Curated annotation (Swiss-Prot):
Cofactor(s), by name: (R)-lipoate
Organism, scientific name: Pyrococcus furiosus (strain ATCC 43587 / DSM 3638 / JCM 8422 / Vc1)
Superkingdom of origin organism: Archaea
Subunit: The glycine cleavage system is composed of four proteins: P, T, L and H.
Alphabetized Gene3D superfamilies for the sequence: 2.40.50.100
CDD domains: GCS_H
Xref: Pfam families: GCV_H (PF01597)
Family per record: Belongs to the GcvH family.
Details of cofactor binding: Binds 1 lipoyl cofactor covalently.
Protein name stated in the entry: Probable glycine cleavage system H protein
UniProt function note: The glycine cleavage system catalyzes the degradation of glycine. The H protein shuttles the methylamine group of glycine from the P protein to the T protein.
Modified residues (N6-lipoyllysine): K70
Keyword annotations of the record: Lipoyl
GO biological process assignments: glycine decarboxylation via glycine cleavage system
């Protein structure tokens, strides 16, 4: 784990400037969630609008929304592909994202252009440097 101030960054993941993370699984699918920075900025999450299984997204499309006491925030697709699974636990327990943002994934995506799109994402060290600029 890398720490930047109060924010934790899990190594081995890829990150976006919009504070989503991507974990590449052995079968070539990816898990997507929001970072520690994102959940702390949002505050206590009250609701996660999970995407539909089967939804096809392009990188940068709105994947879903998360709602906190403070704000509603869009979560963007960090890679293009098809949503093949969602984390149903979050429907009843959105606070799991606050408790452990790197375990509480939102969606599993079957990517269509992963190798190319990963090049556009940051690794943990680059994301840590990015957080220092905020």
């Amino acid at each position: 784990m890398i720490e930047v101030g109060e924010y934790k960054i899990k190594e081995g993941l890829y990150y976006t400037k919009e504070h989503e993370w991507v974990q590449v699984l052995e079968d070539g699918t990816v898990l997507v969630g929001i970072t520690d920075y994102a959940q702390k900025e949002l505050g206590d999450l009250a609701y996660v609008e999970l995407p539909e299984v089967g939804k096809v997204v392009e990188k940068g499309d709105v994947l879903c929304e998360v709602e906190s006491v403070k704000a509603v925030s869009e979560v963007y697709a960090p890679v293009s592909g098809e949503v093949i699974e969602v984390n149903e636990e979050l429907a009843d327990s959105p606070e799991k994202i606050n408790e452990d943002p790197y375990e509480a994934w939102i969606a599993k995506i079957k990517p269509k252009n992963l190798e190319e799109e990963l090049k556009e994402l940051m690794d943990a060290k680059a994301y840590a440097e990015y957080l220092k600029t905020l």
